[in-house]
Regions:
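Sec-dependent bacterial lipoprotein signal peptides
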Residues: 1-24
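Bacterial Sec-dependent N-terminal signal peptides
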Residues: 20-50, 97, 176, 190, ...
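Acidic/histidine-rich, surface-exposed loop or edge segments in extracytoplasmic proteins
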Residues: 35-44, 84-92, 184-189, 274-280
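Post-signal-peptide N-terminal segment of Sec-exported extracytoplasmic proteins
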Residues: 46-81, 85
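FKBP-type peptidyl-prolyl cis-trans isomerase
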Residues: 58, 80-90, 170-185, 253-263, ...
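Aromatic/histidine-rich interaction motifs
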Residues: 92, 97-162, 270-359
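Extended compositionally biased segments used for macromolecular assembly or nucleic-acid engagement
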Residues: 210, 215-237
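Extracytoplasmic
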Residues: 347, 379-614
Length: 614
């Protein structure tokens, strides 16, 4: 259990004594006593303005940046406010002064310290190791770390640069955390940062030789032009916010030299030999070739989405309590068509013998301008035999939002359950590129709720004369059953399904709930065999109950216990090669019909008879 030095919100009647005790226990900078109080009706703006002995410099920067009204307005602001002593240190270390800061630098300084959320004030009780769920006003994430002091107390650090000395000052429009250093986010790429880390010199050299550092350097896709001219649009009577920019992001996993050396690798040349044992000898003389072994080795360490260590695995309330330690995710790496598996605890590619590659949390979450660097505890490779016969030889369930990296990089996935003032998001048909395409007639909605019967709270709802194509995760060659997870609704409509361009069976009715005779759902507790025979009967009709591992707060049931939570068996498919596969759904009945898209599953056919209910 982590013990954190925290002082809760105080009222004036608590007295000066309580404030002084908190000051001593948190070992804070030289703050005025009233910095520890929360006065009724104060905003973030008035809180800092009313304490010139502690926050005069930040207050002045806010005013000179023209942002006086920002922290005074209604909203949900989480402000990490540096003390005046923190600014003294910053000015001295950067050989500058308040007067020398440009207007742009002042705005950046304000935005670097403020998170503006639609509904959340981030209190320390909500912190976990890694990034906070909402980026700051400069689209950079606040990285939280817990570091023990010399006295053995766990202290909270932000961006590994600044310590929180006064936490959780709750105010009318947000919360203030007082910090002891000015936050200075890196403006360098991940490759440039790695070049400055001597402990990773072998990996950094390999990254340079492959030129893959150039592939992870961009921050925005400047080729994307949004067709939207307003902040909000109306879709089916709902207020939706269209995605206007396409931000890019990356995650880089790197073995430190110590891990390399433990594997007998002391130079890039030796790393090339090591990589060749897994990835072959094609184009051996050209490390920039995507077929080269070193290039493939490095590519498998890269994701085209930025994620901190607490962002790989879903952590919301829609997982059954018994299944928390069994949670998993699958992501396609930048080694084309090759997946990496994450399990709870950030165990990468865990084998049946319990061997896995871990992440060294203390050396990870290195924040660059467009992503994160994480340190590995063992060598990470895509071993064809192990991945096909062990790691990926299982049911692979993946949420709809996990497919396009654009939904992660632009703060959509797992971020929609606490919106205020609008219902969700929409996007243009080309926003997600090849990952997700739909026609202009599609009325496309992305929204979420912890109280709906969804796999990870998120859902996609499409109406109109829709025609939607999804690039499913690539899997190893083999024979798989593919399933669609959805919620059956009376307005579901009828659609034709396709896989890899081929029409699949007859049209599917998404408006049948499970208890209708076409499906035949019977609650497990109404059977004598815990639903075993009913499962067989439903499979014969092309359906399955929802998974027991997913929990719905509203109704206090798992999806298996919910009559409207179904899996439709799309069919059985044999894939000869590694390649992307495409799932298409086309409305053929009425523009009022809905396609509800929650998740997809691949299941090796050899495992179906022994499959669990999770």
């Amino acid at each position: 259990m982590i013990t954190i030095c925290i002082m809760n919100k105080c009222s004036v009647c608590c007295g000066i004594t309580a404030a002084l005790l908190a000051l001593a226990s948190c070992n804070s900078d030289d703050l005025s006593d009233d910095s520890y109080y929360t006065f009724k009706g104060e905003t973030v703006a008035t809180y800092i303005e009313n304490r010139p002995d502690s926050f005069a410099v930040f207050t002045q920067i806010v005013k000179e940046a023209g942002e006086q009204s920002l922290l005074a307005t209604y909203g949900h602001y989480t402000a990490f406010i540096p003390t005046d002593m923190a600014f003294e240190t910053y000015f001295r270390e950067h050989n500058t002064s308040l007067e020398q800061l440009t207007l742009e630098e002042k705005k950046d300084m304000v935005y670097n310290h403020i998170i503006r959320s639609t509904a959340i004030d981030y209190l320390t009780k909500d912190f976990t190791e890694g990034a906070l769920g909402t980026s700051n006003m400069n689209n950079r994430y606040m990285i939280i770390s817990y570091i023990a002091s010399d006295e053995g107390r766990n202290q909270i650090w932000v961006n590994k640069q600044s310590r929180i000395v006064v936490p959780d000052v709750e105010l009318h429009n947000g919360v203030v955390h007082v910090i002891d250093h000015v936050l200075v986010p890196s403006d360098e790429t991940l490759g440039s940062i790695l070049d400055q880390m001597p402990a990773y010199s072998i990996f950094a050299d390999a990254l340079r030789q492959t030129h893959l550092n150039d592939s992870i350097a961009e921050t925005y896709d400047m080729s994307y032009v949004s067709p939207y001219t307003t902040e909000f649009v109306n879709i089916l009577g709902y207020t939706m916010k269209p995605l206007q920019q396409r931000r890019l992001g990356y995650t880089l996993f790197a073995e430190p030299n110590s891990v390399m050396q433990a594997a007998g690798i002391n130079s890039v040349d030796e790393l090339k030999q090591y990589a060749a044992t897994y990835y072959g000898s094609e184009d051996a003389a050209d490390p920039t070739s995507r077929r080269n072994a070193l290039n493939r080795f490095i590519s498998y360490h890269l994701l085209n989405r930025q994620m901190s260590t607490n962002a790989f695995i879903y952590s919301g309330p829609c997982t059954s309590s018994y299944y928390m330690d069994k949670r998993y995710e699958y992501y396609e790496t930048m080694l084309e068509n090759r997946l990496i598996e994450f399990k709870a605890g950030n165990r990468l590619n865990e084998q049946q013998n319990a061997r896995f590659v871990g992440i060294d949390e203390s050396a990870s979450n290195i924040d660059g301008m467009n992503g994160f660097i994480h340190s590995l505890t063992d060598m990470l490779v895509y071993d064809e035999t192990i991945m096909q016969q062990d790691v990926l030889n299982k049911r692979i369930r993946f949420d709809a939002y996990s497919i396009p990296p654009q939904l992660t990089n632009n703060n959509i996935r797992w971020k929609l359950t606490n919106l205020d003032g609008f219902g969700g998001y929409t996007m243009s048909p080309d926003y997600c590129g090849d990952y997700f395409r739909f026609n202009d007639a599609s009325k496309f909605i992305m929204w979420a709720s912890d109280y709906w019967t969804n796999y990870q709270a998120d859902e996609i709802s499409v109406r109109g004369w829709y025609d939607v194509t999804v690039r499913m995760l690539p899997v190893p060659p083999g024979t798989y059953e593919i399933r669609l997870g959805y919620s059956a609704r009376s307005w579901g409509g009828i659609a034709q399904l396709f896989v890899d361009g081929d029409i699949i069976g007859i049209p599917v009715s998404f408006n049948y709930t499970g208890d209708q005779p076409q499906i035949g759902w019977i609650s497990d507790d109404q059977t004598t065999d815990n639903g075993a025979e009913n499962d067989k009967m439903m499979r014969n009709r092309g359906y399955m109950k929802g998974p027991n591992s997913v929990y719905a707060i509203n109704g206090q049931k798992t999806l298996r216990q919910n009559v409207g939570s179904l899996r439709f068996i799309v069919g059985t498919f044999t894939f000869q090669d590694y390649a992307p596969h495409y799932f298409r759904v086309k409305n053929i009945e009425s523009e009022l019909g809905e396609f509800h898209f929650d998740y997809l599953e691949y299941v090796p056919t050899s495992l179906i008879d022994s499959e669990d209910k999770d």
